[in-house]
From Swiss-Prot:
InterPro entries assigned to the protein according to its UniProt record, in alphabetical order: Ribosomal_bS20, Ribosomal_bS20_sf
Gene from which this protein is expressed: rpsT
Source species: Helicobacter acinonychis (strain Sheeba)
Superkingdom: Bacteria
Protein's name in the database: Small ribosomal subunit protein bS20
Any single biological process term in GO: translation
Record's function text: Binds directly to 16S ribosomal RNA.
GO CC term, one of those recorded: small ribosomal subunit
Keywords carried by this UniProt record: Ribonucleoprotein, Ribosomal protein, RNA-binding, rRNA-binding
Molecular-function GO terms, alphabetical: small ribosomal subunit rRNA binding; structural constituent of ribosome
Length: 89
């Protein structure tokens, strides 16, 4: 247990940040999972709709500073490639 006031504050801050990070990481995973599930069942319309939402959300996280620009672009690019693959098939 912390012996100093500043150490106690740091513990509180760490807990708060951990919860916030967990929330965003879960949200990102769920967004990506939704697109991948639509791709898995070859539902082109649903996949494109979810890709549009994923693109919007991931870039919103970039503007908030949660994700780096290249990370979001890479994720969107890979999702886009998988959706395009089933659309052409």
């Amino acid at each position: 247990m912390a012996n100093h006031k500043s150490a106690e504050k740091r513990i509180r801050q760490t807990i708060k940040r951990t919860e916030r990070n967990r929330f965003y990481k879960t949200k990102i995973k769920n967004i990506i999972k939704a697109v991948r599930e639509a791709v898995a069942v070859n539902d082109v319309e649903k996949a494109q709709e979810r890709l549009k939402i994923a693109n919007k959300e991931l870039h919103k996280f970039v503007s908030k500073g949660i994700l780096k620009k290249n990370t979001a672009s890479r994720k969107v690019s890979r999702l886009n490639a998988s959706v395009k693959k089933i659309a052409l098939a």
